[in-house]
A protein has these predicted regions:
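Short, small/polar-rich loop/turn modules that mediate ligand/substrate recognition or access, typified
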Residues: 105, 110-112, 177-179
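Alpha-helical segment proximal to the catalytic Tyr-Lys
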Residues: 58, 102-106, 175
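Active-site helix of classical SDR
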Residues: 53, 89, 97
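Active-site loop immediately N-terminal to the catalytic Tyr-X3-Lys motif
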Residues: 31, 78-84, 154, 172
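Substrate-binding pocket helix/loop in short-chain dehydrogenase/reductase
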Residues: 29-30, 37-42, 68, 147
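Residue(s) in the substrate-gating loop at a strand-loop-helix junction
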Residues: 73
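C-terminal helical subdomain
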Residues: 115, 138-173, 177, 186
Length: 190
């Protein structure tokens, strides 16, 4: 991360935007979940966000402008049976975002920190999910069918829906927003 940051600062004369967007979901009962799977999710979903923030705040302070956008999930807002480990990581991203937003504000650092919480989005994360994990014994894994049954709008979200939210939070259009959760889920959390 430090090397990536240095190359960005060299190439662009500063660092103004960080988007932390990495995640894996390993479902299953907390009783049978392997410690290695717990730690792998923590490392990718939460430690990665921490490291991005840690290494990118100093050059943002120097640039006198910054926006950090962390990708969480609706699973960071509401629990799901057999996704406890994933819930923990995405809930951690949610509260890390709020804590860092307040730290930046209290120190008068010119950095906004916000999170995006996608719902059921048409991405490869669903390809490796076990249907039983998603809806306690359900036999569906088809994303569109799942969205139709679970999401109030009955629609599946698409990566562009999330990208537009991230773009908004990274832009000056959201200059007065920090510590905010942007939920893009077709009403799933309503």
């Amino acid at each position: 991360m430090a090397e990536c940051r240095s190359k960005s600062v060299e190439a662009y004369g500063g660092l103004h935007i960080l988007v932390n967007n990495a995640g894996i979901a390993i479902g299953g009962s907390i009783v049978t979940l392997a410690l290695e799977d717990w730690q792998r999710q923590q490392a990718i979903n939460l430690d990665g966000v921490f490291l991005g923030i840690k290494h990118c705040i100093p050059p943002m302070i120097e640039s006198e402008l910054g926006s950090i956008v962390n990708l969480s999930s609706v699973a960071g807002i509401k629990g799901a049976a057999s996704l406890s480990a994933y819930n923990a990581t995405k809930g951690g991203v949610r509260l890390l975002t709020k804590g860092v937003a307040l730290e930046c504000a209290n120190n008068r650092w010119p950095i906004r920190v916000n999170s995006v919480h996608p719902g059921i989005i048409d991405t490869p994360i669903w390809d490796k999910m076990n249907p039983e994990v998603l809806q306690g014994g359900a036999n569906i894994i088809d994303r569109e069918e799942m969205a139709e049954l679970s999401v109030p709008t009955g629609q599946l979200g698409y990566p562009l829906d999330i990208a537009n939210g991230v773009l908004f939070l990274a832009s000056d259009e959201s200059r007065y927003m920090t510590g905010t959760e942007l939920i893009i889920d077709g009403g799933l959390c309503a």
